[in-house]
Amino acid sequence: FDYLAKVVGQWAKDRQSETTAVLVRDRSQRERVVDALHERGVQTRAVGHGSIPPGAPVVMTMHRAKGIEFSKVFLFGVSSRSIPMGIKDYDFDKDEGDQALLRERSLLYVAASRARDELVVSWTDQPSPLLSASVSSVAASTS
């Protein structure tokens, strides 16, 4: 949460707060992120249903962000434990598992493509396997 607070706090100082979003996997994670940022002095607004309130960076689920563009996006918690979610439940049916994996991949694409100018992706422990090729190419290009 400290790195998230540092990045989002800097974006807010740069007057980018109204075009900034933190995207998370689910509603419970959204609430944890809002609380953690508040504890670190970074004001955000949780967005569920309805319009997006002006004045502060928003925190919303990846699903909720569909169709909305932001200047800067922080994808929080894109770890192997959270994305893809529930794929093991389809181990008994390959076709259903393939469809579920495609939906998870599409969700991650939608979330990442909400960023117009800057995208930051974070994870704990291991990154999502859906990021592995991208993470490898970024790591190679920055070393």
Predicted feature residues:
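A short, glycine/Asx- and small/polar-enriched loop/turn
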Residues: P53-V58
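Short, aromatic/basic amphipathic alpha-helical patches
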Residues: R32-G41, P129-T142
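Helicase P-loop NTPase motor core
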Residues: F1-T44, G48-I52, A65
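Conserved helicase C-terminal RecA-like lobe
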Residues: Q16-T19, M60-V135
